[in-house]
Amino acid sequence: MNTNIDNINEFIRKTFDPLTTRKESFNIRLNYKEYKLTISFLQNNYILFTCKSNFDFYGNSLHKNDVNNSFQNIENIPANVKNDIISLINSNNLSIKEFLNLNMIIICLSEKNTGDTIFEFFLNKLNEKTMNNDVIKMLFKKKENKQEDEYNKIINSNLNTLETFNRMYGLSIKGNETEINLTFNNKMNKSSPLLKITTKGFLLFCKNKFLNLNKLVLKNNEINELNILHNLDTTNLKYLDLSGNNISSIESISDLNFPKLEKLILSKNQIKDVIYLKNIRAPILRDLDLSMNQIQNLDVLNSSSWPHLKSFDLSYNQINSIEFFKNASFPILEYLNLNTNLVKNMEPITHLSKLTILILNQNPFSQMDFLPKCDFKNLKEIYFYSCNITTVQYLQNAKFPNLITLSLPENNITYITTLRYVNFPKLKKLSLYGNNIEDITPLQYANFPSLLELYLYQNNIKNISCLNQFKFTKLITLSLMSNQISDINVFKNTQFNFNLETLALSKNKIKDISVFSDYSTISFYNLKELWLDHNEINNIDKLDKAKINKIVRIKLGHNLIQKINVFERMNFFALAEIDLNNNVISDLSPLVWIKLRNLKKIHLANNSFIINNNNYALNTLNNKGIQCILQSEEEQK
């Protein structure tokens, strides 16, 4: 966007200095096209968002015909509003006291040559309280040694472009204005009254305007009904976001016509009844988001048809039955999110053959007995976080040839015996953390040839000797944190060593880590992250010989390490961060000879050394550009 900065500064100066000329329009260039921007003040209690004819203020008067034209299509505007406009224009002695009482800003953008209005925005509640808002203070500053009425000096050095001005007021200008964004949740302080939109009395649209409007964002305001849209031409609207408001009823949505609407977002409201969606006139709707409401009953949508719907988000509601899916039509539904509801029976969705992502987290169905009945040939991701599941036996008969992610964390699974019979040839991510699993040997028989990530942390695993039988040769992430593991010698000859990038063994009972430096160990050629913190390690003397040449971060905090002489010999070219917090290190002098040219951070908090006795080592590291962190994360906060 090319903008004439001098014109903007001159304009703002004139607009906010009540003692100067009444001309309140200036020219700008927007996307290589010329426009005219007009801002003015008047006194009333309405917010209007219209596209009525542009009116310009020249000199001290405004022709009556212009006024009439300006309001010819606006409904419910009191006569005193028109009088306020004329009074403002004709006034030659507007004082700061009157200025502080003004509570409306008009912002009007029009094409320079044709005079056609691109948009017009009315902002209410500009009063003395508003003037104390941080955003307003950024614009004006009282001149030194001057009277109170001279709040006209611009002090915000960042207010150099129209984009900045727009962002401050939550506006979005894009060429011929096909998008309107009135999000309250912007960079302004959330206590600001500037962009609070409530009922239709405060948000009025002019009929038959914005014919090219295809995106409307009104999220995070105080809208409580959909009647505010009744005067808006929705013929070309493709995207409508009303999330984060106070909408409890969507009854009027069936009166609206959305022939081209593709995405409707009604999340974070107070909607309970969705029956009116059954008759919504949105024939090509593809994405419907009803998450974070108070919906309980979906059966009212029985026999409804959603021929083009691809994404349906019902998460974080109080839904206890999804029977309506049996009789409703979702021929191409790909994404279904039922996260955090009260559904016990998932069988009604088994026929949704086009599903690619299914999220069933935190529902109390406890068993996956519906899986063998599922016609999910296209399914790529399925999530069962915290569903009280006790067995994985039903997975052996599930036919998911394209499954990539299987997530079963935070359940009550103890045995995974039947996983030896499971065949998911494209599976890349398996999450079984937060269960009660002790024996992982069945995984050595599972047919997961494409597996890249395996998460087994927070279980009761003690023995990992079966890892060398795992056929996951492509594995890049293995997490075994928070188990009961003490022996890790199996890593001498595990088949996935070469490709592994992250190995997490934190919070176990490991004492001996010599396996990493044993000459017979298969190289961890691509390993970048090695987590060994919160164990019982006291000796790292041979760590410099470890086959981890590409290592970037080593976590050794919360162990029993005393000597760190190994760092004199260590020469890992990519190593950038070492965590040695909470050990019993008393001497830092070996760090003086450190050769790790890419090392950026070394964590040394809560050790036994005395800082004054180790200043030379600390200063040497600092001179090499290595940050020595002597406080824990908690202390830093």
Predicted regions span which residues?
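Conserved hydrophobic beta-strand positions in leucine-rich repeat
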Residues: 180-182, 214-218, 235-242, 262-266, ...
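Acidic, low-complexity intrinsically disordered segments
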Residues: 112-146
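LRR N-terminal entry segment and analogous cap-like coil->beta motifs
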Residues: 152-228, 232-234, 238, 246
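A structural signal for beta-rich interaction modules in eukaryotic proteins
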Residues: 7-125
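A structural signal for leucine-rich repeat
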Residues: 202-209, 227-234, 251-258, 275-282, ...
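Leucine-rich solenoid repeat scaffolds
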Residues: 586-637
